[in-house]
Amino acid sequence: LSPGTAKTLVEALADGGRARIKGQLAEVPLGWKVRRIDFGAGPQWAMTIPWGDVTTAWQSTGIANIQVFVPTPRWLIWAAKAGNVTRPLMSLPAIQGYLKSLVDRRVKGPDEQTRARLTTHVWGEARNGAGEQRVIRLRTANGYALTVDGALAVRRFIEDQAPAPGCYTPSKLCGAQLVEELPGSGRFEVSEC
């Protein structure tokens, strides 16, 4: 976790969680849903978090109900749930300042060697109205490298293809396969449940 990411999380504490419910962006409690998920390296506890994917995935797919899960130690899940009680305090400038100063003192972020060693395991689950279910998994480079490589790939695509002006998610602009073409990425693996 980089200091910048940690500070973004501190800022988000006061806002609670987010999910897409029946096509609408909805506020939900922190740690709203908890379950065990095999992201690709064995089952782990995971909880919902308010990442931007609840918006971008909806823009890309039109899927009406979207939650984003991240692997989380159980103690942190319970801390997030307990944090729902103290959420009103989290927006106070003094609390924000104190928590960010803790980040400055304690969070150093992954160094280059650590980042080179890390991979990201992405998991998705979809169900249709008939109850059919599919799971998709993807292994990529660490999140920092993926972000840089993805941004550069989109830039090259725009330069080469000159798409119509507008607002796009990367998959709507370049196709879902873009992520498979990035350094350190594998292929999508789809399975029935």
For the regions a protein language model found, what residue spans apply to each?
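C-terminal helical cap and adjacent loop that interface with cofactors, partners, or active-site loops
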Residues: 111-193
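Active-site-lining helix/loop region of Rossmann-like oxidoreductase modules
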Residues: 1-127, 132-135, 145
